[in-house]
């Protein structure tokens, strides 16, 4: 552990997402956050390469916690998406705050400053129905209370999804359904940080988004970047690297490491 705060992301081993893990780990470290990553608990060559790129080769002291869960291959995407809500099961107790985020959402500035003794939700003003996964923050102890966690990650996910897969018709919002229902009892304790909608892109203010890349760059504020997939491609990698260079002030050594990681990832695919 390097920092007192950690962001929780999740990924399976799809190249659309897994490639981004060292990049967002690097970015969150630059602004003072550690990373907790939820992922299916199965070994493979790509997994070992990506984790070693962070732990053994990164040009900074890594602070990465991996929490695994078990699921069928059929349910892997759904379990991965929802697993972020269950990090409080095993999160390092010394963390003052853990906050949910996305593995393909690159932080561009030190925007997030949630209090340890509060539940903080960012961007609820842009969502009529759900609490957004990006971003919700609380202490590990509070997350255990909110989510009624038992200490068994897989069992807790199983229990919730047994119910929510029946009552939710859209599986892509089940994670938000779970979060919204769980926070319903705490609405009087929540600190809301409004994000506001950009007049340029209809996305949140400060968001660079892959679905409106040119328009969102008209934003003067920089908060986060929803990175283009596949991020390692010849078309998209220069875009991703440029956001890192322009917003996170990487050293030459760090840039070289990022470039080498991308090249090595392509070889191992």
Residue ranges and their predicted role:
Residues 1-73, 256, 264-269:
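N-terminal anchoring/stem segment of glycosyltransferases
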Residues 22-30, 90, 177-185:
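Short, hydrophobic/amphipathic alpha-helical patches that form generic packing surfaces
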Residues 13-15, 42-44, 71-73, 104-107, ...:
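Short, solvent-exposed loop/turn segments at secondary-structure junctions
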Residues 117-143:
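Short beta-strand-to-loop element that shapes/binds the nucleotide-sugar donor at the catalytic cleft/hinge
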